[in-house]
A protein has these predicted regions:
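Exposed beta-sheet edge and beta->alpha loop/turn motif
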Residues: 118-152
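A solvent-exposed, acidic/Ser-Thr-rich amphipathic alpha-helical stretch
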Residues: 57-112, 116-118
Length: 167
Protein backbone atom coordinates (compact mmCIF):
# COMPACT_ATOMS: atom_id res chain seq x y z
CA UNK A 1 0.00 0.00 0.00
CA UNK A 2 2.89 2.35 0.79
CA UNK A 3 4.35 1.68 -2.66
CA UNK A 4 1.05 2.59 -4.34
CA UNK A 5 0.76 5.80 -2.32
CA UNK A 6 4.35 6.70 -3.15
CA UNK A 7 3.72 6.01 -6.86
CA UNK A 8 0.60 8.23 -6.84
CA UNK A 9 2.41 11.07 -5.06
CA UNK A 10 5.37 10.83 -7.45
CA UNK A 11 3.09 10.83 -10.49
CA UNK A 12 1.12 13.85 -9.25
CA UNK A 13 4.37 15.69 -8.49
CA UNK A 14 5.73 15.06 -11.97
CA UNK A 15 2.48 16.07 -13.64
CA UNK A 16 2.28 19.30 -11.68
CA UNK A 17 5.75 20.29 -12.95
CA UNK A 18 4.57 20.28 -16.56
CA UNK A 19 3.16 23.37 -18.23
CA UNK A 20 0.10 22.72 -20.34
CA UNK A 21 -0.01 24.67 -23.57
CA UNK A 22 -2.75 24.27 -26.18
CA UNK A 23 -3.52 20.81 -24.86
CA UNK A 24 0.11 19.69 -24.99
CA UNK A 25 2.15 18.83 -21.94
CA UNK A 26 5.30 20.90 -21.96
CA UNK A 27 8.04 20.56 -19.34
CA UNK A 28 8.38 23.62 -17.11
CA UNK A 29 11.91 24.34 -18.37
CA UNK A 30 10.95 24.18 -22.07
CA UNK A 31 11.05 27.25 -24.30
CA UNK A 32 8.43 25.81 -26.64
CA UNK A 33 7.10 22.67 -28.25
CA UNK A 34 6.68 21.10 -31.69
CA UNK A 35 3.55 19.66 -33.30
CA UNK A 36 3.03 18.01 -36.68
CA UNK A 37 -0.43 19.33 -37.53
CA UNK A 38 -2.14 22.64 -36.80
CA UNK A 39 -4.01 25.57 -38.34
CA UNK A 40 -0.60 27.05 -39.17
CA UNK A 41 0.63 23.96 -41.03
CA UNK A 42 -2.70 24.05 -42.89
CA UNK A 43 -2.01 27.72 -43.74
CA UNK A 44 1.33 26.77 -45.33
CA UNK A 45 -0.41 24.03 -47.34
CA UNK A 46 -3.08 26.54 -48.41
CA UNK A 47 -0.42 28.97 -49.69
CA UNK A 48 1.39 26.17 -51.56
CA UNK A 49 -1.83 25.10 -53.28
CA UNK A 50 -2.69 28.72 -54.16
CA UNK A 51 0.79 29.07 -55.68
CA UNK A 52 0.34 26.13 -58.06
CA UNK A 53 -3.17 27.30 -59.01
CA UNK A 54 -1.92 30.86 -59.67
CA UNK A 55 -4.59 32.06 -57.20
CA UNK A 56 -2.97 35.31 -56.08
CA UNK A 57 -5.99 36.36 -53.98
CA UNK A 58 -5.80 33.25 -51.80
CA UNK A 59 -2.00 33.36 -51.80
CA UNK A 60 -1.98 36.98 -50.57
CA UNK A 61 -4.57 36.17 -47.89
CA UNK A 62 -2.08 33.79 -46.25
CA UNK A 63 0.44 36.59 -45.57
CA UNK A 64 0.52 39.88 -43.70
CA UNK A 65 0.57 42.91 -46.00
CA UNK A 66 4.16 43.66 -44.96
CA UNK A 67 5.42 40.07 -45.24
CA UNK A 68 9.06 39.58 -46.20
CA UNK A 69 10.46 36.78 -48.35
CA UNK A 70 14.07 35.67 -48.00
CA UNK A 71 15.01 33.47 -50.95
CA UNK A 72 18.55 32.17 -50.84
CA UNK A 73 20.50 35.47 -50.73
CA UNK A 74 17.69 37.79 -51.89
CA UNK A 75 14.79 39.42 -50.10
CA UNK A 76 11.45 40.68 -51.38
CA UNK A 77 8.12 42.07 -50.25
CA UNK A 78 4.82 40.27 -50.83
CA UNK A 79 4.15 42.47 -53.87
CA UNK A 80 7.58 41.72 -55.33
CA UNK A 81 7.17 38.00 -54.64
CA UNK A 82 3.82 37.89 -56.44
CA UNK A 83 5.29 39.90 -59.36
CA UNK A 84 8.08 37.32 -59.68
CA UNK A 85 5.61 34.45 -59.64
CA UNK A 86 3.47 36.26 -62.22
CA UNK A 87 6.53 36.77 -64.45
CA UNK A 88 7.12 33.02 -64.35
CA UNK A 89 3.46 32.39 -65.17
CA UNK A 90 3.63 34.89 -68.07
CA UNK A 91 6.65 32.98 -69.45
CA UNK A 92 4.50 29.84 -69.49
CA UNK A 93 6.04 28.16 -66.45
CA UNK A 94 3.55 25.86 -64.74
CA UNK A 95 4.03 24.85 -61.10
CA UNK A 96 2.99 21.42 -59.85
CA UNK A 97 3.16 20.54 -56.17
CA UNK A 98 4.50 16.99 -56.02
CA UNK A 99 4.34 16.81 -52.25
CA UNK A 100 5.00 18.55 -49.01
CA UNK A 101 7.28 16.14 -47.24
CA UNK A 102 8.01 16.76 -43.61
CA UNK A 103 6.08 19.67 -42.09
CA UNK A 104 5.86 20.72 -38.46
CA UNK A 105 5.25 23.75 -36.27
CA UNK A 106 7.40 24.95 -33.42
CA UNK A 107 5.55 27.15 -30.93
CA UNK A 108 7.52 29.28 -28.51
CA UNK A 109 5.97 29.98 -25.12
CA UNK A 110 7.43 33.50 -25.00
CA UNK A 111 7.01 35.65 -28.13
CA UNK A 112 10.15 36.86 -29.88
CA UNK A 113 10.81 40.64 -30.14
CA UNK A 114 8.68 40.87 -33.29
CA UNK A 115 5.79 39.08 -31.59
CA UNK A 116 6.33 35.85 -33.52
CA UNK A 117 5.53 32.72 -31.59
CA UNK A 118 5.01 30.13 -34.31
CA UNK A 119 7.38 28.80 -36.93
CA UNK A 120 6.36 26.24 -39.54
CA UNK A 121 9.15 24.29 -41.21
CA UNK A 122 8.44 22.30 -44.36
CA UNK A 123 10.13 20.53 -47.23
CA UNK A 124 8.21 21.22 -50.44
CA UNK A 125 8.81 19.42 -53.72
CA UNK A 126 7.61 21.01 -57.00
CA UNK A 127 7.91 20.28 -60.70
CA UNK A 128 8.20 23.39 -62.86
CA UNK A 129 7.39 22.92 -66.54
CA UNK A 130 7.73 25.17 -69.56
CA UNK A 131 6.98 23.65 -72.93
CA UNK A 132 8.61 20.24 -73.02
CA UNK A 133 11.16 21.06 -70.34
CA UNK A 134 10.63 20.19 -66.65
CA UNK A 135 12.72 20.51 -63.52
CA UNK A 136 12.16 19.35 -59.97
CA UNK A 137 12.86 21.92 -57.27
CA UNK A 138 13.01 21.07 -53.57
CA UNK A 139 12.40 23.95 -51.20
CA UNK A 140 13.39 24.07 -47.53
CA UNK A 141 10.89 26.60 -46.12
CA UNK A 142 10.62 28.33 -42.75
CA UNK A 143 7.51 30.46 -42.20
CA UNK A 144 7.22 32.89 -39.29
CA UNK A 145 3.56 33.13 -38.28
CA UNK A 146 1.71 35.55 -36.06
CA UNK A 147 -2.06 35.69 -35.53
CA UNK A 148 -2.79 33.23 -38.33
CA UNK A 149 -0.79 35.02 -41.05
CA UNK A 150 2.69 34.42 -42.39
CA UNK A 151 4.87 37.45 -41.76
CA UNK A 152 8.14 36.10 -43.12
CA UNK A 153 9.17 33.24 -45.36
CA UNK A 154 12.72 31.91 -45.60
CA UNK A 155 13.41 29.69 -48.62
CA UNK A 156 16.49 27.69 -49.51
CA UNK A 157 16.65 25.90 -52.86
CA UNK A 158 18.76 25.36 -55.97
CA UNK A 159 17.54 27.99 -58.42
CA UNK A 160 19.86 27.13 -61.34
CA UNK A 161 17.17 25.15 -63.16
CA UNK A 162 14.65 27.97 -62.75
CA UNK A 163 17.02 30.40 -64.47
CA UNK A 164 17.24 27.98 -67.41
CA UNK A 165 13.43 27.75 -67.66
CA UNK A 166 13.12 31.55 -67.65
CA UNK A 167 15.38 31.93 -70.74
Amino acid sequence: MKKIALLVITTISLMSCDTKSNGHNVPSNATGYTIDSSANTDLVRKAANALVNNDTTTYKSCYTSDAKFYENNDSATLTQNIAGLQAMHDKGIVWKLNKIGAIWETIYLTPKASGKTSYVISYQNYTLTRGGKSIVVRFNVLNNIKDGKMMAEHLRYDNSGIAELMK
